[in-house]
Amino acid sequence: MFEKLINQIKELSTIDFKEATEKIRKYIDEISEEDFNEIVKQIGTIPENIEHDSTEEKLYSKASDIVLARCFRLLGLASRALDERADSADILAESISGYKYSLVADAKCFRLSRTAKNQKDFKVSNLSDWRGSENEYAVLVAPYFQYPQSTSQIYSKALENNVCLLSWEHISILLEKM
């Protein structure tokens, strides 16, 4: 199923970005939960056949936002990927039960070939700023293998700014338990 998503992204990369985004949103929202869960397990890694700094890569990133928004919906939140691209959160989610809270989230994807990560790649402080006064929480989701294995500014920034760090693997496990 992941390969089908990649093929969709490649095919749609030649049309208007907004139109391509809507088609990808429709595709992701309509696939079965079983197929969707397979995508969740792989979405954190950008395939090398997606061109660097290309429309394909931007669409892949947008697809990851749409995937995370659907994950939050499956976990019981009202959620959507936002259209804004620069200097704002990618996803907004709100509780729909008795608890009234909202969160902003950022979905991160990296290439396996990417080894030099630094805290700027994760934008933890920015995510906290994007939360603003109207959202209680901020969540960053990235591939587990891309988080540093020892002390890092990423962790201290997350603690300082009250940003929850999750991995795509954590999200996948939560979805399996539903």
Feature names for model-found ranges:
Residues 111-125, 148-150:
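Active-site-adjacent loop/helix micro-motif of nuclease/hydrolase catalytic cores
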Residues 126-131:
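Substrate-engagement module of ASCE P-loop NTPases
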Residues 154-178:
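Charged, structured surface patches that assemble and position nucleic-acid processing machinery
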Residues 69-91:
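A short acidic/basic microdomain associated with nuclease active sites
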Residues 83, 109, 141-145:
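Structural motif
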Residues 93-104:
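Active-site beta-strand-loop-beta-strand hairpin of nuclease catalytic cores
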Residues 1-59:
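Interdomain/boundary linker segments immediately adjacent to catalytic/signaling cores
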Residues 132-159:
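Nucleic-acid nuclease catalytic cores
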